[in-house]
Regions:
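Sensory coupling linkers of modular signal transduction proteins
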Residues: 99-125
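Terminal output helix/cap of sensory domains in signal transduction proteins
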Residues: 7-8, 39, 46-89
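Short, acidic, Ser/Thr-enriched surface-loop or helix-capping motifs
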Residues: 24, 85, 102
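Sensory modules in modular signal-transduction proteins
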Residues: 1-40
Length: 125
């Protein structure tokens, strides 16, 4: 049996093959996994944990819109796409959003899970 369940959960999030970012209801970045940083080309120093998501993801207007809509509407999105630019290269990002609630049903924030699907979207394999 796992001795430290919190560490185990953290390892699961850190080892996801897709990107995951989570923002609390006040708009503060709570978590960004390593793959999210890799997809968005943001290193450890630029994760902005605790920062307002508008500052953290200012270079990605479409991603800002996804987070804003999730926070404002509370609606979950399944399997949608956005385009983001990185170093003048467009990336097609497939994403889903979900509300984060505690065991009592209290809403805590939103999470966006995503992948770079540029090669799939362009028809390349």
């Amino acid at each position: 049996m796992v001795s430290d369940i919190k560490e185990y959960y953290q390892c699961i999030l850190d080892n996801l093959t897709g990107g995951l970012i989570s923002v609390d209801l006040s708009g503060r970045v709570v978590y960004m996994n390593p793959m999210a940083g890799k997809i968005l080309h943001m290193d450890e120093d630029h994760k902005c944990l605790g920062c307002d998501y508008n500052k953290a993801y200012a270079g990605f207007p479409a991603l800002l819109g996804v987070v804003k809509e999730a926070l404002e509407t509370g609606k979950s999105v399944r399997r949608a796409e956005i385009s983001v630019m990185h170093a003048n290269v467009p990336l097609v990002i497939g994403y889903s959003t979900m509300r984060v609630k505690n065991h009592d049903g209290k809403e805590l924030g939103v999470t966006v899970i995503f992948q770079d699907i540029s090669f799939v979207a362009s028809g390349k394999k």
